[in-house]
Every structure is written in C-alpha cells, then in structure tokens.
Amino acid sequence: SSELCKEEKIKVLAQNVNDNLKGAFTGEVSIDMLKSINVDGVILGHSERREYYNEDDDLLLRKLKVSLENNFKVYFCIGESLEDREKNNHFEKVKNQLDKTVFKIDNIDPENLVIAYEPIWAIGTGLTASPEQAQEIHKYIRNLLSERFGNKISDNTSIIYGGSVKPNS
C-alpha cells in the first residue's frame, strides 16, 4: 500500500513518533521505522495526544527536534480551548505553545514544517471556527513566525486549519 500511495502521490502521515532514534521502547515507533514504510511525515501536538497521553511541550519539543533533525516533515498542531477563546486568551495560548516548542529551534526548514491551527473547541463539538476567525489566527501565527525567524521562513511555512468544518463554512 505504501508503494501505491507513492505512485498516486498520496501523503501518508503518522499520528505519533518516539523522541528517541535508537533504543528499546516497546510499543513506540521510531522515525527510521516510519521512513522504512514510506511514511511522509508526522502529526505532533494534536490536542488528543496532549490530553489523553499527557504530551507536554517539553516532550513535543524533543519529538519536533528529532523529526526535523532527521528531515522528517512535521505537521505541528497548536490551538486553544473554548474557555481560552471565550476569555479572549487564544492569541496568548497559541503564542505560548509556539514559544515552548517551534520557537526553541534555531534552524527551521519551512519545507519540513507545517503549522496546523487546531482550535480544540471546534473538534467534534459541532462548533466551527468562522473563516474570519481562522484567517485572524493564521495571520497572527504568520506574524509570530516572521518576528522569530524572519520573512523568508515565515512566508514559506505552510499554515493550515485543523478544526471541524461544515458545508456552509
């Protein structure tokens, strides 16, 4: 199936990767394992992994570093809860997540990093972010990237929306 995906130009992403390259870590999947079956990248920072598996920013930073250092594409999720949104803390929440992870890395290759804005309140709740809300936070993220890494990196880093959508939105 990995060969078919390659032929059809379908990208296959893992939902997790271990932060160690070598060693005995039963139940974990290494970058080398994923690359050996033609996996194209990994999703890191998803709200469900943060909540159910207690993945904190320190662990996510280690996973992010090992992935990027090994030329493995990362789709890095950031976002806020409904409570953060309602208290107008969503900008601060997103900035804090970036400050503790992505912004701790010196050499970012925008070809290997995608920032996925994932408003937690818009995942499986029936709520969706409006196009205006998504654009507003995307612009904010782009500005933060520019401040930290400069325009060249900022302009070439993909930012996507990772929350729920409805047909009319």
Predicted regions and their residues:
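Active-site loop-to-helix "anion-binding N-cap" substructures in soluble metabolic enzymes
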Residues: 1-116, 120-169
